[in-house]
Amino acid sequence: MAPDSGDVNPAGGRPTDIADLPTFHHPTLSPSGDRVVYYHDGSGRNELYIQSVDGGDRRRVSDGEVPRDAGWHLGWLDSSTVLFHRDEGGDEQNDLVAIDVETGDTETLVAPDGQALCFDIAPGEFLVYGSDAGEQMNLYRYDLETGRTRQLTRHDRPVWSAQVDPDGERVAYVCNEADDLDNRDTYVVDADGGEPSCLEVGETGAECHPHDWFSGGDRLLLSDDSRGRSRVGVYDFREETVTWLSDGTHEESGVVVAPDERVVATRVREAAVVPVVYEEWAGDGPAEARELDVPEGVVEYGYLPDGDRITANGGLLLPHSTPTRRSTLAVYDLDADDRRTLVEPDHGPFDPDRFVDAEYVTYESDDVPPWCEDGEAREVGALLYDPLEGSAADDGAALPGVVWVHGGPHVQAQRSFSPYVQFLAASGYAVLRPNYRGSAGRGREFQHAIHGDWGGMEQADIAAGGRWLADREWVDGDRLAVIGGSFGGFSAYTQLVRYPELWAAGIAWVGITDLPALYEESMPHYRSNLERQMGDPEENESLWRDRSPIAHVESMAASVCIVHGVNDPRCPVSQARRFRDALVEQGRESGKDGGFEYVELGEEGHGSTDRRQRRRRFELIGEFLERRL
């Protein structure tokens, strides 16, 4: 049997103590590139700290003024002022707040009736942010000197991300005005407003994203997946042409343009995210990329920009982790090919050599369920964690297994350090993290295969992963659980009602149960994404209802733990309450000895980086699995 999650294990410390290991988030360089600001929770909660890129001790800036959850990125308004996002208990209705790094004084700059996301900053002049204060997520400009706000775009579909050019004259951003809902184009608009122009880069239906401007403002680093995989290229505004750097072998995305015009990008390879540099790229064909000398893992650059990545002395700011090494913040010397650590990972009482490594595996998913009309077999990649090779002792007994399903769906289970997986492995569970169809990292066709098919073949992929894990001789196939959050929570619910014979238990975290209701309750930009994923909710009403887990609640046999933050704006808590009520109508009782368990988390939304809340999640997961498996 699995050990109690409170027992001391051979890695040192109790598995639940992994939740308390100090963590940093969103390292962001100052405009001069000589300092970095980041969230760090070494004090017990997330606070802001500043550190020189040359090393030395970090200095604390905030004292409770910032949110407990460091979920949103930071930015520098000028050399002495940092911007952060502040919401109420995880509701994501962010205000944009400035904090003086010397005095700690704060000032709310932007407080819309809705959500605000800072996309980029022209230091000392203005910031560009997205807001759904109107009928859709659009771009706005806030002038730092006058305090005035003006709307820059008026699209009917959401704007995603933006980049201000070096002179503060133009803004590149992502939107879609095509009939094809999968399409994403890069637009450019004057920083004072006006009519935006669309860059003619790829084919309709492809995604084109801007990443960084060149110093003269006449070229733009971008990526496009018209040929199936995302390629990095340089758009020349003078010639209106693109020079492609990537050869299309791997998924690649741009990161930053160095002052000497070397281009840094990331490359996805078997769930690892590798930093690469293109040093000489002028010409007609693909250029040669050099992979940076870091352990195989994940360079942790977020979806939204955390400012520049090049330090004052020309180094690359590099946050990185591996399956067995927690996040490290380093400065990488692109010339010498070595790195210097700024923030060391704190492993506390744990021996990192005893953490469980991730093995990249593949399996066949060839079972087409009867509710899928056009399903086809696929090879699915996944990460396998075998605790018999790591921190858990081999007592000769088969281990219970957990299939951990990522959210998104257009993200990927990657070879970064996962405290949740290491907690499970240290507690004696085998873990599989499948990258089902719809996941990122394998090209456009694989990623889009889920569109119009939520609850269909991607769930067949997950179930096939469960059967594959159960077939390992060291796994007890009768003690298998499925866990996931957000879309992963939708998957946990769906697995339990569609494949009831496979699972002994499940945990659905901030999950989706009723798709039509979710659409009605969503923010406008999330409605647009749901339409992209599942089509028009009225024209496809029967599909939306049939693929909702709540429509099949009577088929569920295993026990489920339903966990939901009461302030979740993406998957509202009403999704959990509807499923709970449906279970009660089926005659199930709630409680530790009942047919299901139900927990609502106060002061929490769609997840949290707060240490206290993280430990609470560890305890909920560990105690439920111990009871049910």
Residue ranges and their predicted role:
Residues 428-443:
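Conserved alpha/beta-hydrolase
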Residues 2-4, 15-26, 31, 35-72, ...:
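Peripheral, non-catalytic segments that deliver or gate enzyme domains
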Residues 439-629:
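Active-site-proximal cap/loop segments of hydrolase catalytic domains
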Residues 405-407, 564:
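The conserved beta1-alpha1 loop
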Residues 400-404, 431:
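Hydrophobic beta-strand anchors of alpha/beta hydrolase catalytic cores
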Residues 1-20, 512-513, 573, 618:
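Terminal disorder- and signal-encoded targeting elements
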Residues 196, 360, 431-433, 598-600:
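Conserved beta-strand scaffold positions in the cores of enzyme catalytic domains, especially
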